């Protein structure tokens, strides 16, 4: 039986420097009462030259570590693998852009852009999304056709709700297709990627809310909205996922200057939602829609799209929702957002917000919001080309964006009660057991065996100590979440033998199997293949909900 005795080691850590707060002097304490306040201030003030910092991250940001990073890396790996499968190539753009590049692209959300101080004569801002920088890149390099994916951080001065994945610094995972192709073909593939991506991450209870910018603009024309008012009315409609129609109508009439008749006409349409076939049939039977040029173009696109979504077998995930407006100014065709049951705020959200002790507390009573979104933007590249004095070039684009923080929050909620996530990718721990005055601990020998495993692509570790006791080695293996131990016994190793043992409570009484040291790599590979015959690691299994 292998030794399992526990040896406790207490390590004392001495600080190399001590920060002392200045105290009030005896003179100050004996001063008149009138000077007490000044003395108190002086006692709290840092000494000149002393650095004082707040050890915290800025509001709306956080450090990521341990099991959270394991989950996030699995999300990135899953999505990047999916993008590559669809022919995507990756690019990287600066985290900040010239302010003029971002200006006028985000409608009312432009106020959320982080502006930087003057940088040597250039006014810059942190990127708000990955779409506008991509369009700038396409225009700047005269690219005619590209499938690109980009996984990177973006920044917004939003009211954060950290536990819901609403942050000021967050990752987006984007896939975009630029170029002229058959109508609705790239659009339908982007929708298919949305479904593939979310289901591969174990998110199955979701709907893709879909609308068409031209249909929405046609509805506004039918209702009598002036062209110059379209965007602000669109931003009001976009609030229907968070506010009731009565509140949106009030905004239209009292704040946006629309008549009751116009608002009611808009309301007749934006309350419609259902399957693609259902809503397409309703709109096709509406003479006002079919006689409006813009709306008719959008309706024709939907008819084409339905053939392709059926081919990709994704119809059941899509809801044709005329209330979806998306506030960003650059969309020209299909628009879509992915929502789940967690997207909406709780029913008593407004009451909970009132009871909250602070704005930060109140922000927790919101929904996760959309977890992915996208749409077609055919004019953005040309807008940059013309503005820079280049030849006008119409490069149609369509794309999708996965919100990593919001997806992460959903996955974290789902697996919190599941098996503990392995903090590392380590599969095998190499140990050595022995004793006596001549016992060296076999540190170089452990390193040699570990190197053999590394060379075979097997994740392995060992304790960085010459004579580590058995308990400490088992503890290290348990902390790393290892499945297998390769043990160098003092006498067995001299005979060219190694012991391979499964780890875990159910194998506590199992001494393992003695094998030839020359065969250690294939034997370990065989043992690992038996642990998960489907080839999936624990994190992937948890994310997929298996």
UniProtKB/Swiss-Prot annotation:
Its EC number is 6.1.1.21. Disruption phenotype: Lethal. GO terms for cellular component: cytoplasm; cytosol; mitochondrion. Transmembrane segments: none annotated. InterPro entries: aa-tRNA-synth_II, aa-tRNA-synth_II/BPL/LPL, Anticodon-bd, Anticodon-bd_dom_sf, His-tRNA-ligase, HisRS-like_core, HisRS/HisZ, HisRS_anticodon. L-histidine binds at residues 129-131, 156, 172, 176, 326, 330-331. Pfam families: HGTP_anticodon, tRNA-synt_His. The keyword rRNA processing does not apply. CDD domains: HisRS-like_core (cd00773), HisRS_anticodon (cd00859). It catalyses: tRNA(His) + L-histidine + ATP = L-histidyl-tRNA(His) + AMP + diphosphate + H(+). Changing residue 381 to L: Partially rescues the lethal phenotype of the deletion mutant. The keyword DNA repair does not apply. GO terms for biological process: histidyl-tRNA aminoacylation; mitochondrial translation. Keywords: Aminoacyl-tRNA synthetase, ATP-binding, Cytoplasm, Ligase, Mitochondrion, Nucleotide-binding, Protein biosynthesis, Transit peptide. It comes from the Eukaryota. GO terms for molecular function: aminoacyl-tRNA ligase activity; ATP binding; histidine-tRNA ligase activity; mRNA binding; RNA binding; sequence-specific mRNA binding. Residues 1-20 form a transit peptide. Present with 26800 molecules/cell in log phase SD medium. Catalyzes the aminoacylation of histidyl-tRNA in both the cytoplasm and the mitochondrion. Belongs to the class-II aminoacyl-tRNA synthetase family. This is Histidine--tRNA ligase, mitochondrial. It comes from Saccharomyces cerevisiae (strain ATCC 204508 / S288c).
């Amino acid at each position: 039986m292998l030794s399992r005795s526990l040896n406790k080691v207490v390590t004392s850590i001495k600080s190399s420097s001590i920060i002392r707060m200045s105290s009030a002097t005896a003179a100050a304490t004996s001063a008149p009462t009138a000077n007490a306040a000044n003395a108190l201030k002086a006692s709290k003030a840092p000494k000149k030259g002393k650095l004082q910092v707040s050890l915290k991250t800025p509001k709306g940001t956080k450090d990521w570590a341990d099991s959270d990073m394991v989950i996030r890396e699995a999300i990135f790996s899953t999505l990047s693998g999916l993008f590559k499968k669809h022919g995507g190539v990756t690019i990287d753009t600066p985290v900040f852009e010239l302010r003029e590049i971002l200006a006028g692209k985000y409608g009312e959300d432009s106020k959320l852009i982080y502006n930087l101080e003057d940088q040597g004569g250039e006014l810059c801002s942190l990127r708000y999304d990955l779409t506008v920088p991509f369009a700038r890149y396409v225009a700047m390099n005269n690219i005619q056709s590209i499938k690109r994916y980009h996984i990177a951080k973006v920044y917004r001065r939003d009211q954060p709700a950290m536990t819901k994945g609403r942050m000021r610094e967050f990752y987006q995972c984007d896939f975009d297709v630029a170029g002229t192709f058959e109508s609705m073909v790239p659009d339908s593939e982007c929708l298919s990627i949305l479904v593939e991506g979310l289901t591969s991450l174990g998110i199955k209870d979701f709907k893709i809310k879909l609308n068409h910018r031209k249909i929405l603009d046609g509805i506004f024309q039918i209702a009598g909205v002036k062209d110059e008012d379209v965007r602000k009315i669109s931003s009001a409609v976009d609030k229907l996922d968070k506010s009731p129609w009565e509140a949106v109508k009030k905004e239209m009439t009292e704040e946006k200057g629309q008549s009751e008749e116009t608002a009611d006409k808009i309301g007749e349409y934006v309350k419609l939602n259902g399957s693609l076939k259902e809503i397409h049939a309703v709109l096709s039977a509406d003479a006002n829609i079919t006689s409006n040029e813009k709306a008719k173009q959008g309706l024709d696109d939907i008819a084409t799209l339905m053939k392709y979504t059926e081919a990709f077998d994704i119809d059941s995930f899509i809801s044709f929702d005329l209330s979806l407006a998306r506030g960003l100014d650059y969309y020209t065709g299909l628009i879509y957002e992915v929502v789940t049951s967690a997207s909406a705020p709780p029913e008593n959200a407004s009451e909970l917000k009132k009871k909250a002790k602070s704005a930060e507390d109140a922000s927790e009573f919101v929904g996760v919001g959309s977890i992915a979104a996208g749409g077609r933007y055919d004019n953005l590249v040309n807008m940059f080309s013309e503005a820079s004095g280049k030849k006008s070039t119409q490069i149609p684009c369509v794309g999708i964006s996965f919100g990593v923080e919001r997806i992460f929050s959903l996955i974290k909620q789902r697996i919190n009660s599941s098996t503990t996530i392995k903090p590392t990718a380590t599969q095998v721990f190499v140990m050595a057991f022995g004793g006596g005055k001549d016992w060296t601990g076999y540190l170089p020998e452990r390193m040699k065996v570990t190197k053999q495993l590394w060379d075979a692509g097997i994740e392995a570790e060992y304790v960085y100590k010459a004579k580590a006791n058995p308990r400490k080695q088992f503890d290290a293996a348990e902390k790393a979440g290892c499945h297998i131990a390769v043990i160098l016994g003092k006498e067995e190793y001299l005979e060219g033998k190694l012991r391979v043992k499964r780890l875990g409570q159910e194998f506590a009484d199992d001494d393992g199997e003695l094998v030839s040291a020359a065969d250690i790599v294939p034997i370990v590979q065989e043992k690992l293949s038996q642990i998960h015959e489907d080839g999936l690691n624990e994190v992937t299994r948890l994310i997929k909900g298996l």
